[in-house]
Curated annotation (Swiss-Prot):
Catalytic activity: 2 a phenolic donor + H2O2 = 2 a phenolic radical donor + 2 H2O
A biological process from GO: response to oxidative stress
Disulfide cysteine pairs (residue numbers): C41-C117, C74-C79, C123-C317, C202-C228
Annotated compartments: Secreted
Binding site for substrate: P165
Gene that produces this protein: POD1
Keyword set, alphabetical order: Calcium, Disulfide bond, Glycoprotein, Heme, Hydrogen peroxide, Iron, Metal-binding, Oxidoreductase, Peroxidase, Pyrrolidone carboxylic acid, Secreted, Signal
Entry-linked PROSITE patterns: PEROXIDASE_1, PEROXIDASE_2, PEROXIDASE_4
Co-factor remark: Binds 1 heme b (iron(II)-protoporphyrin IX) group per subunit. Binds 2 calcium ions per subunit.
GO molecular function, a single term: metal ion binding
Name of this protein: Basic peroxidase
One GO term describing the cellular component: extracellular region
Amino acid sequence: MSYHKSSGTILMVPLFMLLISVNYFMSCNAQLSTTFYDTTCPTALSTIRTSIRSSVSSNRRNAALVIRLLFHDCFVQGCDASLLLSGAGSERASPANDGVLGYEVIDAAKAAVERVCPGVVSCADILAVAARDASVAVGGPSWTVRLGRRDSTTSNAAQAATDLPRGNMVLSQLISNFANKGLNTREMVALSGSHTLGQARCIRFRGRIYNSTLRIEPNFNRSLSQACPPTGNDATLRPLDLVTPNSFDNNYYRNLVTSRGLLISDQVLFNADSTDSIVTEYVNNPATFAADFAAAMVKMSEIGVVTGTSGIVRTLCGNPS
């Protein structure tokens, strides 16, 4: 068999494959709709909203947990609820997802929906809607969620290890990591603003204290050092936003400007580099941050969706059936 081809033909192969990939992505997203459950489960959205409001009301930290669940799901294998699957070899069991919590919040929302519309609404859609409702519940922005995602039947722990961003990444690594998912630098900075909510463990921010040349405010450094020594206390929690950790606002960015970002991947966003201007804009214009965050969440929540006759609608989000 001969493999001699003209240079023009060789160039056409990757272009052809790129067009196929783009068309497939557009086709999948085209099957999403805001009216997807209007006839099959008209109370789906209100049922999810009530469940999430109740969960966040009982513990405001749940808002951060739910938003993080969506992020970790979408970055590995797409927004297909693969993260929610339990068992050996699953994304959920990956060390990269160690410390990810809140699965019971989605399970409760799923159970509530199953009571009114059994076997209709996917876990992937419930997670996407729940993240939006969690944001609203703590004073954050709302956004339109297009529906019609299906649930995957597989989950990949190894892919979680390679695809998820890490708390010790430098700026160039973060930009590349998000670009791999079709998200630009501004969207990366906006989505990082979800760290206005939630907490991180000592094992995740220890490098910020002892192994980083990034600027760190002295009193903040002293406080972190006391809570998180060079060894031990791995599970000690500290808020990602030390000012208003349970409310959605722009204080996360204000903290970065004063060198009080908890993770290395936080502080690199404001470190005399290309993203400083975006951080400054979000400090000065909280409405711009809220709008950009909402738009980025919409885009992220449609990464790699499973639609149509592909995938399934799980009865229990943790089981592949």
